[in-house]
Amino acid sequence: MSELQTVRKKIHGNFFLEKTYKEGKLFYEVLRYKDDYIGINYGYLEDELREETYINDNRIGMVIVNEKDKIYICTLDEKRHEVGITVTYHNKSGRLAHEIDYLDDICMATNRVYKDGFIKNVPLIKSLEKRENIDKKYYKKYYEFKHKKNILRVEKIYCKKTRKRVDFKAYKNNKLYGFREVRDDNGNIILRGSHLNNKKIGIWHEYENHKVKIKVAFDENEKFTGIYREFFSNGDVKEEKYYFQGEEIKSKEK
């Protein structure tokens, strides 16, 4: 077995940037407050990059697993239950490969499979789906599931001119719940992240020209937490900051 080597860099007070190496390569990195993980945790595995968030030392919010061929995205609530929309995208084309809808960790629909850009095997969804005009520019398609006293509503908004999806989200009892994705009128990705109880929580990615520009995490009060990174177009880190409860943690080192 390969030995892991962990290096801790003090940022300020009880805040440390912790990096773990395996065979000389970066394997894991996270910001720590005392012994607790905070914000985005990066796991650099052999064939994938895994991103997840810890708040109060509990894994919560959007989880992203970026593999060679596909990107898997889900949302965990405070009980670590999978909630809202879980998606898998083809890495090369960016097309949606698979969608599963969860309400309180219960799978409500598994037949959201896409092949070559077309929906396949979706009789349940087709029978539930409704269409509604929003204004002259946009319309939405939506469907709902009920479980006990809770209602899951999955909603997709489209541009009438381009017919591209511009918003993809879910609600639990009329409050934003789980994964959300926002695109421009031409279908270019702008934002990805998660909500719980109508609030941003966990990892959010901001995009520019199809590439990640900013990675940041929000705590339960929608304040920045953990490692904040802004990137150049080639993927190199342009700026790195550290946050806790919305306040920047400034290193004493120059």
Task: Outline where the language-model segments fall.
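Glycine/tyrosine- and acidic-biased, solvent-exposed loop/turn segments at the edges of beta-strands
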Residues: 1-254
